């Protein structure tokens, strides 16, 4: 039986742990001064994975908070995945060769598909594809741009090129604590035939259990952000809730 994996999220901006609402850089709340301390706390509570986002990097198109990422990867036993501003093979190799377990490529899947396909060929399962969608269409550049590419179509294309893991974010629900978009997440898993990690909108352990019901359809886990920071539930409660799901 496949386990349903939880990914506590740390979004980094100016070296701090923050949350944005629907990706709006003007709607920021700071939750901590040290990404490493936050990650250590999640690991202590039982996290097997930590999901890191370099928000400055996503906006700038280059790595910005990489020092914090590598500190976490080197000092903690939990596995680490990172997205945001990764646009070159040097970036990908730099992270993977220094302890990061998985690199998430998002905007470049639309803007530079040849690069993404080449990275999939070279690094396989160590690359995850981040598909952030607004009304079914992929958004790029830290969600500042919406493309004319449908998430399901891009997912299918990249699955054929070797993508094994997708991270699907429904922007409308992100940071809103309004419940995840289960339907679109399951649709992407079915369209690609691969595993999809759900992101955005989780507000309760019940939401996580609802997602976990679809793990046999390919929904392999969920990223949790704001719900943990606003203490809707603890990570320990969440892990216990999905253990038998």
Curated annotation (Swiss-Prot):
It comes from the Bacteria. GO terms for molecular function: 1-(5-phosphoribosyl)-5-[(5-phosphoribosylamino)methylideneamino]imidazole-4-carboxamide isomerase activity. It holds the Pfam family His_biosynth. GO terms for biological process: L-histidine biosynthetic process; L-tryptophan biosynthetic process. It is found in: Cytoplasm. Its main location: cytoplasm. The active site is at residues 11, 132. GO terms for cellular component: cytoplasm. Pathway: Amino-acid biosynthesis; L-histidine biosynthesis; L-histidine from 5-phospho-alpha-D-ribose 1-diphosphate: step 4/9. Its EC number is 5.3.1.16. Belongs to the HisA/HisF family. PANTHER family: 1-(5-PHOSPHORIBOSYL)-5-[(5-PHOSPHORIBOSYLAMINO)METHYLIDENEAMINO] IMIDAZOLE-4-CARBOXAMIDE ISOMERASE (PTHR43090:SF2). This is 1-(5-phosphoribosyl)-5-[(5-phosphoribosylamino)methylideneamino] imidazole-4-carboxamide isomerase. It comes from Bacillus velezensis (strain DSM 23117 / BGSC 10A6 / LMG 26770 / FZB42) (Bacillus amyloliquefaciens subsp. plantarum). The lineage of its organism: Bacteria, Bacillati, Bacillota, Bacilli, Bacillales. The gene is hisA.
